[in-house]
Amino acid sequence: MAPKAAEKKPAGKKPAEKAPAEKLPKAEKKITKEGGSEKKKKKSKKNIETYKIYIFKVLKQVHPDIGISGKAMGIMNSFINDIFEKLAQESSRLARYNKKPTITSREIQTAVRLVLPGELSKHAVSEGTKAVTKFTSS
């Protein structure tokens, strides 16, 4: 009869010890799941990167009294994304041709000259050079 009593005591202690330990992680898991779902919703909203703010700032610098519609803003945003993608492809192609592992400001400048036409490329190069010198000086 002594072995039965010995078996009952550890068995009685183990479930009593496990039950509170199991309940705490379950409660913690529920909190993390609820918090995780809220964080996921916030992350999906934050991941949308647009240039709308910057387009609007430039518009107000050029024409302070003129607004822009949502469709026009979407078109401008896709236009900027398209131009950046073309510049990135061209600069990466130039780096590959020259057997260089990195894209420097020189590749970007050459890509701008190749992608953008005429006077627009000249203005873009001068503004880019000005921005790079301002960045390196500070």
Curated annotation (Swiss-Prot):
Kindly indicate where the leader peptide sits in this chain.
Answer: none
Alphabetically, the GO molecular function entries are: DNA binding; protein heterodimerization activity; structural constituent of chromatin
Q: Where is this region: Disordered?
A: 1-45
Which keywords annotate this record? Acetylation, Chromosome, DNA-binding, Isopeptide bond, Methylation, Nucleosome core, Nucleus, Ubl conjugation
Q: Which residues carry this modification: N-methylalanine?
A: 2
Q: Which domain of life is it from?
A: Eukaryota
> GO cellular-component terms in the record?
nucleosome; nucleus
User: Where are the N6-acetyllysine residues found in this chain?
Assistant: 8, 13, 18, 23, 29-30
Q: Which InterPro entries match?
A: Histone-fold, Histone_H2A/H2B/H3, Histone_H2B, HISTONE_H2B_site
Where does this polypeptide localize?
Answer: Nucleus; Chromosome
Q: Which residues carry this modification: N,N-dimethylalanine?
A: 2
Question: Where does the record place the modification N6,N6-dimethyllysine?
Answer: 14
Where are residues bearing N6-methyllysine located in the sequence?
4
Task: List N,N,N-trimethylalanine occurrences by residue.
Answer: 2
Modified how: Can be acetylated to form H2BK6ac, H2BK33ac and H2BK34ac. Monoubiquitinated by BRE1 to form H2BK143ub1 and deubiquitinated by UBP26. Required for heterochromatic histone H3 di- and trimethylation at H3K4me. May give a specific tag for epigenetic transcriptional activation.
Q: Where is the composition biased (Basic and acidic residues)?
A: 1-38
Per its UniProt record, what PANTHER family does this chain match?
A: HISTONE H2B
User: What is stated as this protein's family in its record?
Assistant: Belongs to the histone H2B family.
- What's this chain's function? Core component of nucleosome. Nucleosomes wrap and compact DNA into chromatin, limiting DNA accessibility to the cellular machineries which require DNA as a template. Histones thereby play a central role in transcription regulation, DNA repair, DNA replication and chromosomal stability. DNA accessibility is regulated via a complex set of post-translational modifications of histones, also called histone code, and nucleosome remodeling.
Q: How does it assemble?
A: The nucleosome is a histone octamer containing two molecules each of H2A, H2B, H3 and H4 assembled in one H3-H4 heterotetramer and two H2A-H2B heterodimers. The octamer wraps approximately 147 bp of DNA.
Report the protein name in the record. Answer: Histone H2B.8
Organism, by scientific name, is Arabidopsis thaliana (Mouse-ear cress)
